C-alpha cells in the first residue's frame, strides 16, 4: 500500500484512493480475505497520518456483485468505515451453477464461454448486463467500476458485436439506468496501453455526457508504476466530447 502512495506523490497527485478487491464467499488469488480487513484499515490509517502533509488519501473497496447474498449493499460491506465503494462484476454463474471468471485474457474467455456456456455469447452478454443492472438497483456503492469490461473479450469472440443493434440498445439502457441512480462511472484506463480500449468503450463517452453522468478517470493499477497510465489520453478523449476536466 505504501509503495502506491509514494508513487502517487512522486507523480504529483494531490489526492489518491486505495481500493483493494473485497472479499468473496470463496478464496481467489486477487481478492482480500476477511481476516485481513482490520490490517487493511489500520495500515491505511497509519499511512494517511504519515503522509497527511503531502497527499490527501481515501480508502475504499472494489466489491463484486456475485449473487443476492454477496454484493456491495449487504450489511457487512456497508458497516465498514470506508470513504467510497466501487461496484463491479467479474464473475458469472454458468447454467450448471459454476462460478466462471469472465475477466480474463480474450483467449481464455473464449475457452470458458465454450466450456461453460456452450458458446452462447448472447446469453453470456445478457447475463452480464443483467447482473450489472441488478447491482445498480441494489446500490451500496458510489462508483461503477469498468462499466462494460466484457466488451473487449466479447468483441474478440465475435467481431462486430459492438455494432449489433441489440447490443448497442442493451448498453444504452444500462447507462440510462446508471444515470437515473446517480452513480459515478469509472473511466478505466488499465487496458488502453496494451489493447487500445477504455472501459467503458469510448464510443459511449458522448452518451455519458448527454445523460449527465459524472465520470472519474481511474487506472485500476495493480502495480504502483502504472497508477498514471493513460490518464492523459482518457482526459483528452473526455474533453473532446464536452466533459470539463
Regions found by a protein language model. Give the residues of each.
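An N-terminally biased module of ancient metal coordination in phosphate/nucleic-acid-related enzymes
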Residues: 1-67, 72, 77-79, 151-165, ...
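Conserved, mostly hydrophobic/aromatic
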Residues: 8, 85, 146, 185, ...
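Short acidic/polar active-site loop segments enriched in Thr and Asp
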Residues: 14-15, 19, 83, 142, ...
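Short beta-strands and strand-loop turn motifs
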Residues: 19-20, 145, 185-190, 216-219
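Extended substrate/RNA-proximal surfaces in nucleic-acid metabolism proteins
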Residues: 37-180
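C-terminal functional module detector
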Residues: 130-133, 138, 203, 236-241
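Extended hydrophobic/aromatic segments used for targeting, binding, or gating
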Residues: 169-172, 187-217, 229-232
Amino acid at each position: 500500500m505504501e509503495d502506491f502512495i509514494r508513487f502517487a506523490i512522486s507523480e504529483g497527485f494531490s489526492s489518491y484512493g486505495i481500493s483493494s478487491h473485497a472479499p468473496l464467499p470463496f478464496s481467489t488469488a486477487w481478492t482480500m480475505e476477511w481476516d485481513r480487513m482490520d490490517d487493511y484499515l489500520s495500515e491505511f490509517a497509519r499511512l494517511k497520518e504519515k503522509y497527511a502533509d503531502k497527499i490527501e488519501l481515501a480508502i475504499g473497496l472494489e466489491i463484486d456483485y456475485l449473487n443476492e447474498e454477496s454484493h456491495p449493499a449487504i450489511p457487512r460491506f456497508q458497516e465498514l468505515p470506508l470513504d467510497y465503494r466501487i461496484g463491479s462484476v467479474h464473475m458469472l454463474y454458468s447454467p450448471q451453477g459454476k462460478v466462471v471468471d469472465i475477466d480474463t485474457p480474450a483467449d481464455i474467455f473464449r475457452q470458458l464461454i465454450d466450456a461453460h456456456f456452450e458458446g452462447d455469447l448472447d446469453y453470456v452478454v445478457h447475463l452480464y448486463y443483467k447482473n450489472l443492472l441488478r447491482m445498480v438497483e441494489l446500490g451500496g456503492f458510489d462508483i461503477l467500476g469498468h462499466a462494460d469490461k466484457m466488451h473487449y473479450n466479447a468483441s474478440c469472440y465475435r467481431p462486430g458485436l459492438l455494432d449489433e443493434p441489440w447490443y448497442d440498445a442493451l448498453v444504452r439502457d444500462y447507462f440510462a439506468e446508471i444515470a437515473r441512480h446517480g452513480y459515478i462511472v469509472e473511466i478505466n484506463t488499465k487496458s488502453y496501453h496494451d489493447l487500445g480500449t477504455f472501459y467503458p468503450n469510448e464510443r459511449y463517452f458522448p452518451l455519458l455526457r448527454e445523460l449527465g453522468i459524472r465520470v472519474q478517470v481511474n487506472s485500476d493499477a495493480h502495480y504502483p508504476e502504472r497508477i498514471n497510465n493513460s490518464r492523459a489520453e482518457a482526459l483528452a478523449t473526455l474533453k473532446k466530447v464536452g466533459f470539463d476536466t
